[in-house]
Amino acid sequence: MNFANVILSKSKPVRNPDRSDESIWTSDECAKYYLCLDGEVFEFHCSQDLLFDVNRQLCDKRQNVHNCELTTETLVSKPLLDMATCANDTHLGCADGTCLPAEYFCDGSLDCDDMSDEGWCDVHYDPNAAERCDPKLCQLPDCFCSKNGTETPGNLVPSQTPQMITLTIDGPVNHENWDAYANQLFTGDRRNPNGCPIKATFFVSHQYTNYRHVQKLWNDGHEIAINSITLRGPEEWWSKNATVEDWFDEMVGQANIINRFGRVRMEDFRGMRVPYLSVGWNRQFLMMQEFGFVYDATVVAPYVDPPYWPYTLDYKMPHRCSGNNQYCPTRSYAGLWEMVINPLKHNNHVCATLEYCPSNFTRDDVYSVLLNNFKRHYLKNRAPFGIHLNAAWLKNNDYLLAIKRFVNELLKLPDVYFVTYREVIDWIRRPTPVLQLRKFEPWQCKSRRFEESEIACPKPNTCKLPSKVLQHDKYMITCSSCPKTYPWLRNEFGFE
């Protein structure tokens, strides 16, 4: 079979089967891959310093690619599971008949010699997959699910249910966006019907973040959540390749950095969002459960009307796994909340967040998209409506003005509340009718007591720090003392 026929017979990217033995491990050859599109073979090339991993079907750093000699993807055999003749009833069979404990299958670690324990692990094949929702067993305050995912907690009718709106912002907090936060959106004069200032949830990443500003946001009552240390690429790394240890290093590591240099208390870190909305399958959620995270805010649901309510992961998700690079959890993670993202619809276009909507949006486009999608929530089941923003997206002044206009208009309604994810979960755990919300304790705006070191300082330290990993000096602003080196993975406190 010649070169073209090999490519045409495959539906996924492959390497050149006719490449010479001498060139197999060269950077140039290992970075190439070929794909058949409409009966024609096209050559592609990974970006500079990246190689193509034929098994993972992505470009990655040289040190992570170990299969330059392979021409096509290695197919993993299907495990025998309960078809194997295992002597122990709690064991299942690998493809080669080897019996292992059932919990070893689809746990993120390779245990079968033939790798079959991790090769067939979507929701249809995982032998340890979560069961379908059972509302009789899943009871508030610790568990919430419904058959189709759209039912209101506490069986409240829409007119009794507050329309919660969640403003969430991903990325670094610094001088480039501080004016938008402190002087444009959260000035203190925009207030919910109970008299409390509107609040947002900030998913903070590490590089370029001013930790004094993070500390001030926390002092002002906003929720601080985690968005990783590195924001590394490629996007598929998070969903396909990150180990449980990687998840711990990235997310718990960032919590440690914010705690040390932004003084945010560890018990206040409730949730996280994965970069690029690349859900990390069971490995991500195993780490979250072990560390004590309360919620994830990464999963994008399909567009439905009425929209989905948040749910706990005690049972199977009420919708299919949607969006790019989404490898949703298949197992049960009791008590862990999924603050599901309901996508936005604009004409025939569906986008997970405003950042993924058409780049030629005008100020009026942004406003109309938000208003039309808000009505789908407000006039139906009143599932929380999310305005999910990216720090870079807000640099567009027209977009910022559209957001401000939308917020101002909605605050005229007597049953609309701009709240944090933590406050959404507080309400779902104790569904409270609109007319009783002025006395709903979790939403009160009582002054919080801070230690002197927890209060954002007027004159923070600007630290110039060496970084062996990044190979150049980095600046970091903090009210705490400067560390010796730039904080990074496995060196969160900058000791080394």
Where are these regions (language model features)?
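Extended, charge-rich low-complexity interaction segments
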Residues: 442-488
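Extracellular/luminal ectodomains of secreted and membrane glycoproteins with large N-terminal domains
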Residues: 27, 57, 102, 106, ...
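Cysteine-rich, disulfide-bonded extracellular modules and peptides in secreted proteins
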Residues: 1-104, 108-122
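Active-site beta->alpha N-cap acidic-glycine motif
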Residues: 128-225, 230-236, 244-286, 290, ...
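N-linked glycosylation sites
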Residues: 64-67, 88, 148, 241, ...
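Aromatic-lined glycan-binding groove of carbohydrate-active enzymes
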Residues: 288, 312-369, 373-377
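Extracellular secreted precursors and ectodomains with disulfide-bonded cysteine-rich loops/domains
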Residues: 28, 34, 44, 57, ...
